[in-house]
């Protein structure tokens, strides 16, 4: 004999009403639609496809960090230039530059591994910038103050012009990647040849000029990528890439101006 089933009173608050329709999806997703900027920061949407407010906030952050990096580098450069004893000690102890190079690689590796880990990403970025400032501060002591200032202003002008051109251009500069990659390795490996084959002033000038063109290309390439390939969360790595482009371009322009000055003196 089947059991007698008794219907549950619908007004009993202790029993859920399973027949009731579930709430609309928008009720669960309400918090996500209240602030669309939050969703865009959580996914991998490229900066160029984000809302204008997010794009502008990202660019302000990137170039503010870049400005701070250049300030720290200039500070170290000024200390070394105004106090030659520091640079003289480094020149007399080349092991320091070698150690500085390997520490820079370790710090850079840590930054690449933890680009979103606050505050470690800022600490790694500051340490890397300081170490680069030590190396650059030693290098610029071989040049006159006039040449250094000329190189700074030329580099700044070229950097701003190329950045502005990339922002308004419709060209896809990511296509330069293959050429720039091969060119960069050429810049790294070619000096090894000079250990066996003596260089000439013409070769040195051509090599510095080629390096200038390569890092001008990298400014176009990296500026395009931070807009079209990077998400708004990747501001630390964006600043780092632009910083390395600026410093490497400055070094090549400084070399060219120094060689031109030597030719005039001769």
Curated annotation (Swiss-Prot):
One of its GO terms (molecular function) is calcium channel activity. GO terms for cellular component: endoplasmic reticulum membrane; fungal-type vacuole membrane; Golgi membrane; membrane; mitochondrial membrane. It is a multi-pass membrane protein. Residues 1-22 are annotated as: Disordered. GO terms for biological process: calcium-mediated signaling; endoplasmic reticulum unfolded protein response. The chain crosses the membrane at residues 70-90, 92-112, 123-143, 147-167, 177-197, 201-221, 240-260. The keyword Transmembrane helix applies. PANTHER family: BAX INHIBITOR-RELATED, PROTEIN LIFEGUARD 4. Links the unfolded protein response and programmed cell death and mediates mitochondrial-dependent apoptosis. Induces cell death and disruption of the mitochondrial transmembrane potential. This is Bax inhibitor 1. The lineage of its organism: Eukaryota, Fungi, Dikarya, Ascomycota, Taphrinomycotina.
């Amino acid at each position: 004999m089947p059991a007698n089933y008794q219907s549950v009173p619908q007004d009993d608050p202790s029993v859920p009403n399973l027949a009731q329709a579930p709430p609309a999806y928008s009720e669960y997703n309400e918090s996500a639609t209240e602030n669309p900027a939050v969703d865009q920061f959580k996914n991998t949407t490229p900066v160029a496809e984000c809302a204008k407010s997010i794009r502008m906030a990202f660019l302000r952050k990137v170039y503010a960090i870049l400005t701070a990096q250049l300030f720290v580098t200039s500070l170290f450069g000024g200390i070394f230039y105004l106090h030659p004893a520091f640079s003289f000690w480094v020149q007399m102890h080349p092991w320091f530059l070698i150690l500085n190079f390997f520490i820079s690689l370790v710090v850079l590796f840590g930054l690449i591994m933890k680009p979103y880990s606050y505050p470690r990403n800022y600490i790694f970025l500051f340490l890397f910038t300081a170490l680069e400032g030590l190396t650059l501060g030693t290098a610029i002591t071989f040049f006159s103050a006039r040449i250094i200032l000329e190189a700074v202003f030329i580099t700044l002008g070229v950097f701003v012009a190329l950045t502005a051109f990339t922002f308004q251009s419709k060209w896809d500069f990511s296509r330069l990647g293959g050429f720039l990659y091969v060119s960069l390795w050429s810049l790294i490996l070619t000096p090894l040849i000079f250990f066996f084959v003596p260089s000439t002033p013409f070769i040195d000038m051509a090599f510095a000029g080629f390096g200038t063109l390569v890092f001008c290309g990298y400014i176009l390439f990296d500026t395009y990528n931070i807009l079209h390939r990077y998400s708004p969360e990747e501001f630390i790595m964006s600043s780092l890439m632009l910083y390395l482009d600026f410093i490497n371009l400055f070094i090549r322009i400084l070399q060219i101006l120094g060689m031109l000055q030597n030719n005039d003196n001769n």
